[in-house]
């Protein structure tokens, strides 16, 4: 199996302490079902901020940054039509795709969340799970720039909330909290014809 040599990454080494590292020793080998991506942009998620501020356990988090875009450097098995040179964006990138929860549509309860994305999105290269059954990357059209593409995962989350709210054209809805997620949810709900 090919070993990936990472040149640099931003790592959270302690609560409130980010360090630019020149060598990432914890990246695993490219294995079947894995895609290597040259990262071009990475956004900061609320979960990254919570980790930075010490509201989440560093022991349970081995990566930093999961909302990113980039170019496929090695498509691995090439599942789901992913090809070398393709522009992609990540989605929920932390689940393993193999455990009972993942196989039953509950990736947010994966017990191996940290193994699917190492060393994270704040690096020059990273690995993402992509199998015929489970993929965490989506192609990005040329009409969307790299920075905007990093919003794929939070947009999917906001869309899921809008669908679960079961609002329909002509309904009235209120979104509490106008941070990034609230703003995205408000735009999605508005596009559905909701006041």
Ranges and model annotations:
Residues 26-27, 59-65, 114-120, 128:
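Short Gly/Pro-enriched turn/cap motifs at secondary-structure boundaries
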Residues 96-176:
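NAD(P)H dinucleotide-binding glycine-rich loop of Rossmann-like/cofactor-binding domains
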Residues 191-195:
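Conserved S-adenosyl-L-methionine
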Residues 28-42, 55-103, 139-143:
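Glycine-rich beta-strand-centered segment in the early N-terminal region that forms part
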Residues 9, 37, 172-173:
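Conserved hydrophobic helix-helix packing surfaces used for dimerization/oligomerization
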């Amino acid at each position: 199996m090919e070993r990936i040599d990472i040149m640099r990454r931003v790592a959270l080494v302690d609560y409130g302490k980010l360090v630019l590292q020149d060598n990432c020793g914890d990246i695993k080998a490219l294995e079947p079902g894995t895609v290597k991506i040259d990262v071009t942009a990475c956004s900061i998620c609320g979960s990254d901020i919570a980790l930075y501020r010490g509201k989440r356990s560093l022991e349970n988090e081995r990566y930093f940054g999961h909302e990113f875009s980039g170019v496929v450097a090695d498509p691995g098995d090439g599942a789901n039509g992913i090809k070398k040179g393709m522009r992609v964006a990540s989605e929920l990138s932390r689940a393993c795709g193999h455990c009972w929860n993942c196989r039953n549509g509950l990736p947010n309860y994966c017990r191996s969340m940290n193994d699917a994305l190492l060393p994270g999105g704040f690096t020059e290269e990273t690995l993402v799970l992509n199998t015929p059954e489970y993929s965490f990357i989506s192609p990005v059209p040329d009409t969307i720039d790299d920075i905007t593409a990093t919003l794929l995962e939070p947009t999917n989350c906001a869309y899921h909330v809008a669908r679960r709210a079961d609002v329909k054209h002509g309904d009235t809805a209120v979104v509490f909290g106008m941070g990034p997620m609230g703003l995205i949810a408000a735009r999605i709900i508005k596009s559905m014809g909701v006041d």
